[in-house]
């Protein structure tokens, strides 16, 4: 039976100093026989997805105390990718994932906490916390702040749903009036919570639920809804329960690595592919697998993408459905149930409640359940009032979306496509692979041939798009924006959104060793590996080269001879110390980013740091 980790600092006469300090934080002698549970929060006033988390940490702490534990809260950093987007701030987003994971390890191990409950929500915070949980492998429960309600606006007498991406598109398109652009901006993000589409934040929170590390409903239940309060209360109770079971009964089944097995990773990735979720999830799942020592690689994702159907399209892949609609249709479990009906899931998995997949589906699948509490939870919907305060409304949909033919979630027989919403491409441009969100690509663009127009920075590409230098038939190549080359692997939401605002999104492709926001749609191919800074062939592309993209065949190739490839490679190497670095880009790189670049791997390895010790 494992000893409580916290006993290192709370037991024995020699730890009088540590106990004195604990007592200064409010602990008493009676607390030293209780589990110390870290409340790992990520509250910040910078991020709408985290603006409401301060009081939620207090709520969870109070529940832990009532259940017989000692709660100790600390905060991680949290970057808002939307605010950091389109300027040098985006260089810091992905590296912050590693800092979050490291800072949690530092706090947990330095203070010998017994367990932790992670309160996350947005893009790099959830994966950073997941990496830490799998690294530390102590009892852990995840509960996120919840999705934002979609924005609503009346245009030409018709109410439409909007989100952050619409604000960017309307703001960049000179054909829209200032008044309309301002109205969109003011209505796009109406409440606290993670942006209302299936962007990276909501994708990761859904995958946390699919992995089994959070309670059912965690990925889709709105931040503003009163039902989400119960999710936090139940999570607080659960972390105390499983902590005691581990330390007092030697029950290891609730540890993160016991739950997030290879089979769980395959199920989570299957869910992601079936939704056409953010391509960033691939990056994060690969990184998490390495932390948890799980055998899960890019090749597994490639195989899954060829057999998992695309059963669900949510903004930005849909103009109709947002997270609130996904929840109404049964959410994560509703979609898993459709995959399970055609035997596309691994059933040998359990979740944080200790329930098997079959039991979870029987209880929480809205097409099967008789449980009135479950049915009531999935009726939770948006009220439509602006607020940054959680749990302020109790609106219920009048009915659930059980339409599996044309509804938000479709059955296998009514799939959008049968080869999934995400795909891995290989070729002489990307020998180790690259990623495309096929759910966001129009059918006419699944096979595309175009002429390269090459840029060595996102900023340079943005300028060219807005100055009408990018034309129909171009393949926009943005290189030296990978984990090492950026450094930091910037998201390319602005280039893809500007292409859309210029009505070029269906007539151009964009390829990069950088990555894309979950809000990206169109023929946007990222994570090209090896990246340019790691001697990848994307560094050898020149203006007007012909590039062939064939998504059905999973290929991406530069149409030049092998001799020409070798010649270009020779010329690049001749640049000496400057080889495989940008020739024309001027960018300040701080010491913090230089440190990240020194150890960063390419995207096919999850952009984790490779450290030899």
Curated annotation (Swiss-Prot):
Family the entry assigns: Belongs to the IlvD/Edd family.
Catalyzed reactions: (2R)-2,3-dihydroxy-3-methylbutanoate = 3-methyl-2-oxobutanoate + H2O; (2R,3R)-2,3-dihydroxy-3-methylpentanoate = (S)-3-methyl-2-oxopentanoate + H2O
Subunit organization: Homodimer.
CC cofactor: [2Fe-2S] cluster; Mg(2+)
Functional pathway: Amino-acid biosynthesis; L-isoleucine biosynthesis; L-isoleucine from 2-oxobutanoate: step 3/4; Amino-acid biosynthesis; L-valine biosynthesis; L-valine from pyruvate: step 3/4
Binding site for Mg(2+): 81, 123-124, 491
Catalytic class of the enzyme: lyase
Positions of modified residues (N6-carboxylysine): 124
Keyword Cell division: no
HAMAP family: IlvD
Co-factor remark: Binds 1 [2Fe-2S] cluster per subunit. This cluster acts as a Lewis acid cofactor.
Function: Functions in the biosynthesis of branched-chain amino acids. Catalyzes the dehydration of (2R,3R)-2,3-dihydroxy-3-methylpentanoate (2,3-dihydroxy-3-methylvalerate) into 2-oxo-3-methylpentanoate (2-oxo-3-methylvalerate) and of (2R)-2,3-dihydroxy-3-methylbutanoate (2,3-dihydroxyisovalerate) into 2-oxo-3-methylbutanoate (2-oxoisovalerate), the penultimate precursor to L-isoleucine and L-valine, respectively.
One GO cellular component, as annotated: cytosol
Active site location: 517 (proton acceptor)
Organism: Buchnera aphidicola subsp. Schlechtendalia chinensis
Residues that, per the record, bind [2Fe-2S] cluster: 122, 195
Disulfide bonds listed in the record: none
UniProt keyword annotation of Transmembrane helix present: no
GO biological process: isoleucine biosynthetic process; L-valine biosynthetic process
Protein name, as recorded: Dihydroxy-acid dehydratase
MF terms (GO), sorted A to Z: 2 iron, 2 sulfur cluster binding; dihydroxy-acid dehydratase activity; magnesium ion binding
Keywords for the protein's UniProt record, in alphabetical order: 2Fe-2S, Amino-acid biosynthesis, Branched-chain amino acid biosynthesis, Iron, Iron-sulfur, Lyase, Magnesium, Metal-binding
Listed InterPro entries: Dihydro-acid_dehy_C, DihydroxyA_deHydtase, DiOHA_6PGluconate_deHydtase_CS, ILV_EDD_C, ILV_EDD_N, IlvD/EDD_N
EC number: 4.2.1.9
């Amino acid at each position: 039976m494992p000893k409580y980790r916290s006993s290192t600092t709370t037991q024995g006469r020699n730890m009088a100093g540590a106990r004195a300090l604990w007592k200064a934080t409010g602990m008493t002698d009676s607390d030293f026989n209780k589990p110390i549970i870290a409340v790992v929060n990520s509250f910040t006033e910078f991020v709408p997805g985290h603006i409401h988390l301060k009081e939620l940490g207090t709520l969870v702490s109070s529940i832990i105390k009532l259940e017989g534990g000692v709660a100790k809260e600390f905060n991680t950093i949290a970057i808002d990718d939307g605010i950091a987007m389109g300027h040098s701030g985006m260089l810091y987003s992905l590296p912050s994932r590693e800092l979050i994971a490291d800072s949690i390890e530092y706090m947990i191990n330095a203070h010998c906490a017994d367990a932790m409950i992670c309160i996350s929500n947005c893009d790099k915070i959830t994966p950073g916390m997941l990496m830490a949980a799998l690294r530390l492998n102590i009892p852990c429960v995840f509960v996120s702040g919840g999705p934002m309600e979609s924005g609503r606006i009346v245009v030409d007498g018709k109410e439409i749903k909007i989100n952050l991406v619409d604000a960017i598109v309307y703001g960049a398109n000179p054909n829209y009036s200032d008044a309309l652009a301002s109205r969109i901006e003011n209505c796009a993000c109406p409440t606290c919570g993670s942006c209302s589409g299936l962007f990276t934040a909501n994708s990761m929170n859904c995958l946390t639920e699919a992995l089994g590390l959070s309670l059912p409903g965690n990925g889709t239940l709105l931040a503003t809804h009163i039902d989400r309060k119960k999710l936090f209360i139940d999570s607080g109770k659960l972390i105390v329960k499983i902590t005691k079971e581990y330390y007092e009964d030697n029950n290891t089944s609730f540890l993160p690595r016991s739950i997030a097995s290879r089979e769980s990773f395959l199920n989570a990735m299957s869910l992601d592919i079936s939704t056409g979720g953010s391509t960033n999830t691939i990056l994060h799942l690969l990184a998490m697998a390495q932390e948890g020592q799980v055998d899960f690689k890019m090749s597994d994702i490639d195989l899954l993408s060829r057999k998992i159907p695309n059963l669900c399209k949510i903004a930005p892949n849909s103009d109709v459905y947002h997270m609130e609609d996904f929840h109404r249709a049964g959410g994560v479990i509703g979609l898993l149930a459709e995959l399970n009906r055609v035997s596309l899931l691994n059933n040998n998995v359990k979740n944080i409640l200790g329930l098997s997949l079959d039991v979870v589906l029987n209880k929480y699948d809205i097409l099967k359940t008789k449980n009135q509490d479950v049915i009531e939870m999935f009726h939770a919907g948006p009220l439509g009032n602006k607020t940054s305060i959680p749990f302020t409304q109790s609106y219920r949909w009048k009915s659930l979306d059980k339409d599996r033919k044309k509804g938000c979630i479709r059955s296998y027989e009514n799939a959008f496509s049968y080869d999934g919403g995400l795909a891995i491409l290989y070729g002489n441009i990307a020998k180790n692979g690259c990623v495309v969100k096929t759910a966001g690509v129009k059918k006419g663009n699944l096979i595309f041939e175009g002429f390269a127009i090459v840029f060595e920075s996102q900023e340079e590409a943005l300028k060219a798009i807005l100055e009408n230098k990018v034309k129909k038939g171009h393949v926009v190549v943005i290189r030296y924006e990978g984990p090492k080359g950026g450094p930091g692997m910037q998201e390319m939401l602005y280039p893809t959104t500007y292409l859309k605002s210029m009505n070029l999104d269906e007539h151009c492709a964009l390829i990069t060793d950088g990555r894309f926001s979950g809000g990206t749609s169109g023929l946007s191919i990222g994570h090209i590996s090896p990246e340019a800074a790691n001697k990848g062939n994307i560094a050898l592309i020149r203006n007007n080269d012909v590039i062939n993209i064939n998504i059905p065949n999973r290929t991406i190739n530069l149409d030049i001879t092998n001799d020409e490839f070798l010649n270009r490679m020779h010329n690049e190497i001749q640049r000496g110390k400057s080889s495989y670095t940008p020739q024309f880009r001027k960018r300040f790189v701080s010491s913090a980013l230089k440190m990240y670049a020194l150890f960063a791997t390419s995207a096919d390895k999850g952009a984790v740091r490779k450290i030899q010790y």
